[in-house]
Amino acid sequence: MRGIIKNIREQLFIHPVESFCDTFFVFHALWTLIWILAYSTNLSLSAISPIFFLLIPLAVLTLAFKGQATGQPTPSATRRARRDTLSVLMLVAGAILLTLFLHRPDADDEQYLGMAFSLLANADQPIQQLPGYDGTLYANAFSVISAYEPLKAMVSYVTGLPLLASYYVLLPALMSAVTVVVTYRLLRELVPEGWLVGMLFFFVVMIAWGDVHRTLANFGFVRMFQGKSVLVSAVVPAIFLYWYLARDKGQAGYHSFLVSAALVTGVGVSRGGLIIGPLVLAFLGLASINFRSLGKGATAILVVTVIIASTLLVFAYRSGWSLMNPSQLVYTPRGDVSSTTNLEMLEFTMGSGARAIFLLMCVAASFLFVEDKRLRYSYQNFLAIFFLLLLIPWTSNFFAKTFQQYLSWRWMWVAPIPVLASVTVGGAVASIRQVSNSALALGVFLVIAVAFAAASPRRVLSQENYTSVRWPDAKLDGDSVYFRPHNKAAAIKNGKLHLEGYEKGF
């Protein structure tokens, strides 16, 4: 027991940023599993509250199973680690401020906020009897797997905070911190000498890239109150991170466990995580296969398996087979139509201007700046898979018709574009600094950042993007909000939600 406590203490004090990140994904994975169990057995929110208090200690306990680094760090390495930690904390503070002060309401909260209200206002009632959660298991699959709104309700239940505070302030701030830490760790693995510049460019992208409604930046700091934003901004990069960290055989078991935790977390924050998470993992797995280390027999089996799988997928697509889209309609900017193209979906999610072109070029070139050769092999293969799918004209149609309607564009979430593009900028600036001087490197970065921000008047923070700066509060307009699950509007009074039929506000 003393050894376990000692190991946990060392991880928390020597690697606080990494420990926070790892603990979060284990915590949220455990919470997701508890929520699914609670819904399936028709428990109440209050019934699972005692278990909720155990989740953080259990998550912290997993740090004890992380192996110790070999050797003692040098004084210079220790100073650098402290400097890096301080830099990350400053970036975290900046991200939290952006999340809290940027105001961009979204109509989907009529559903999500209404479901969270149902849980908090009826904490002692069985979950499946509540508005938004009643009905059959199949009809409410979204309710089963989405644990983000229940987490907000639980936080308000155990702390006494108004629901609007946990929904729009506390939890989004936490998710912004996780996003920054995950991005920092992934960039540090890919471009250890250029991670700081990469992080700065990441922030530029997340503030400026508002060309269209569905850019990944519009699913970033400005929208952390919704689970789909957590999925694309934090969970997908985390799957990359832990997959690459698992290549270290000494830590393979620990980081493989964290890959699983990230996958479960993805399912918990958004139902899209059911497909996006495994899809990312499948692409990373394929990209990591080293054919040189395989024998002829294993290579032949693998090739045959890929051919059979590809044939079956094509057959399923051509035959009209669908997992969750029996209508065979595809979601596009033109509405629900019979077909689309990858180009239309790229414009739908990235825009058609200079920013989109620059980001795609940066992503395509990013493997050139990955220093670790083993990591570069897997990384460049992933990029090859992603761009190959972009070049196949019917990829968006295939994902939408065969799996789910909204995958016509959401399948592109497998590539965290802002992070991967930052690899190129960070790596390029670091290379310039090495062959020239810091002043020139800084000048190049400033030119890139200013040009990117000025490429279009529609930025994340702009009136054209329907974003304003306000004091941290609910991301709602007006003094009421309509709840779809209840088919009525709730009034907002003194920071609390008041709904007809309930004696008090929540």
Language-model segments: residues:
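Active-site lumenal/periplasmic loops and adjacent helix-entry segments of GT-C-fold
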Residues: 91-226, 230-234, 463-477, 484
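Membrane-embedded, hydrophobic transmembrane alpha-helices
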Residues: 1-78, 312-339, 383, 389-390, ...
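Signature aromatic-anchored transmembrane alpha helix within multi-pass, membrane-resident enzymes
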Residues: 263, 302-310, 428-462
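Hydrophobic/aromatic-rich transmembrane helices and adjacent perimembrane loops
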Residues: 173-176, 222, 228-235, 401-431
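Transmembrane catalytic cores of multi-pass membrane glycosyltransferases
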Residues: 106-111, 137, 270-384, 391
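Membrane-interface helix-loop-helix junctions at transmembrane boundaries of multi-pass membrane enzymes
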Residues: 4-5, 11, 78, 189, ...
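Membrane-interface alpha helices of multi-pass inner-membrane proteins
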Residues: 254-272, 282-283
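Extracytoplasmic
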Residues: 447-506
